[in-house]
From Swiss-Prot:
It comes from Agathobacter rectalis (strain ATCC 33656 / DSM 3377 / JCM 17463 / KCTC 5835 / VPI 0990) (Eubacterium rectale). Anthranilate 2 binds at R168. It comes from the Bacteria. Pathway: Amino-acid biosynthesis; L-tryptophan biosynthesis; L-tryptophan from chorismate: step 2/5. Binds 2 magnesium ions per monomer. 5-phospho-alpha-D-ribose 1-diphosphate binds at residues 82, 85-86, 90, 92-95, 110-118, 122. Belongs to the anthranilate phosphoribosyltransferase family. This is Anthranilate phosphoribosyltransferase. Homodimer. GO terms for biological process: L-tryptophan biosynthetic process. It catalyses: N-(5-phospho-beta-D-ribosyl)anthranilate + diphosphate = 5-phospho-alpha-D-ribose 1-diphosphate + anthranilate.
């Protein structure tokens, strides 16, 4: 099937749900070659200026979920994640925001991998902080109960990714897997904040999230091509609440923040990003903290810990300034290594 799919994509034709499912099933089953996988991923990501279609994403996601380890957490978990592929090289905003949300009483199940098209992925950052990222499903549930946060290392829970992981790294640009990662969290989140790299994806991925069981969430796109709620531009948001959708545009100024440049939010190596995370959770002020407050504030609102995003931002600041967020990080490190 993959050969026929590549020809179809090269001819700028969209795949149906069933075709996308069949191809991803072959890839995840190890039935294709590395060359075919690279050709498929490259062709699919460049087929259209509007990125992959909803059917292509949903079909690929369904096949990938079937090949993954699923974890029964017994609780409504939350995930904050960006698709990556925005080439912004920002520090780990989602990871830092996740720690604040966990300190605020949410059950946060992060799901990620090492960097594919950036310098430092979620796994790289957490590892540099001292977190043991190689955890069993049982240990992850323990972490959720004791700390409020766990990390599902994609390599461990999506073992079939071994067929495409090295290829993603070699290609160095975003592929459909940037979208699929956030849609295939082993903990099946009931709440999610998903940042995307393309404005076209905002409403379609909100619909996909609902079909996957998300009750409350947001799909966000920073208008400066950032896969987070942006501090350097307005952000398009599609909010999900029990099956309904509402699309709005927000700006940093709406919440009393000054705009910054994307350069102000740049990160670096895993070690450099780990220091940034600790500095922010330790109370350091500045644009990076503000970016975390915006994203953590939205998270706390989604999780029902605040009645509005504005209240969520105020709560996020209180959590950091009280030392609870840093305590949560240290507890995550301790329990993950015990």
């Amino acid at each position: 099937m993959i050969k026929e799919a590549i020809v179809k994509i090269v001819n700028k034709e969209d795949l149906t749900y069933d075709e996308a499912y069949a191809v991803m099933n072959e890839i995840m089953g190890g039935e294709t070659t590395s060359t075919q996988n690279a050709a498929f991923l490259a062709a699919l990501s460049t087929k259209s200026a509007k990125a992959e279609t909803t059917d292509e994403i949903a079909g690929c996601a369904a096949a990938m979920r079937e090949h993954a380890v699923q974890v029964k957490t017994g609780m409504d978990v939350f995930e904050i994640v960006g698709t990556g592929g925005d080439n912004a090289q920002s520090f780990n905003i989602s990871t830092t925001s996740a720690l604040v949300a966990a300190a605020g009483g949410m059950k946060v199940a992060k799901h990620g991998n090492r960097a594919a098209s950036s310098l430092c992925g979620t796994a790289d950052c957490l590892e540099a902080l001292g977190v043991n990222i190689d955890q069993s499903p049982e240990k992850c549930v323990e972490l959720l109960n004791k700390v409020g946060m766990c990390f599902f290392f994609a390599q461990k829970y999506h073992t079939s990714m071994k067929y495409v992981g090295p290829i993603r790294k070699e290609l160095g640009f975003r592929t459909v897997f940037n979208i699929l990662g956030p849609l295939t969290n082993p903990g099946s989140p009931a709440m999610q904040l998903l940042g995307v790299y393309d404005e076209y994806l905002v409403e379609p991925l909100a619909q996909v999230l609902v079909s996957l069981g998300v009750k409350r969430g947001m799909v966000v796109y920073g208008m400066d091509k950032l896969d987070e709620i942006s501090m350097s531009a307005s952000t398009k948001i599609c909010e999900i609440k029990d099956g309904w959708f509402r699309t709005t545009v927000i700006s940093p100024e709406d919440f009393g923040f000054e705009r910054c440049t994307k350069e102000d939010l740049k990160g670096g190596t895993p070690e450099e990003n780990a220091k940034i995370v600790r500095d922010i959770l330790g109370g350091q002020k500045g644009h990076k903290r503000n970016a975390v407050l915006m994203n953590a504030g939205a998270s706390l609102y989604i999780g029902g810990k605040a009645d509005s995003m504005k209240e969520g931002i105020e709560l996020a600041a209180e959590i950091i300034d009280s030392g609870k967020a840093l305590e949560t990080l240290d507890k995550l490190i301790d329990v993950s290594n015990s």
